[in-house]
Amino acid sequence: MSNQSITIGSLFAIALPLVFAVTTGAALADCKSGFVWREARPNDFVCVTPAQRSEAKAQNANGPNNVQPGGGPYGPTTCRQGYVWREAWDGDTVCVTPTERQEAKNENAANASHTN
């Protein structure tokens, strides 16, 4: 077998799974007009309004200010009094207000009606 055949075969073996992953992800996360991906983390494909996406980014930026200095009973990501984990996905420990956490849950619940 020639080096060229091996190289082409190797490229195909690498490229095919990548193409499949990209097209599958896009198909699963196609937002209706007027909605965008929330992007509260990489691969967060919940469809929300642009204002809601901006809010999630602001929460991410401000979250460290709402963590209990030195940690607490829930570890280093324990929130200060009056704040809770956002829980937009399993493991989301960004500290937000209880109202903001409920908004994230509402966004998750509405996602099906915001996707194509």
Label the predicted regions.
Residues P17-A26:
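C-terminal segment of classical bacterial N-terminal signal peptides
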Residues L28-N116:
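Post-signal/leader-peptide non-cytosolic segments of secretory proteins
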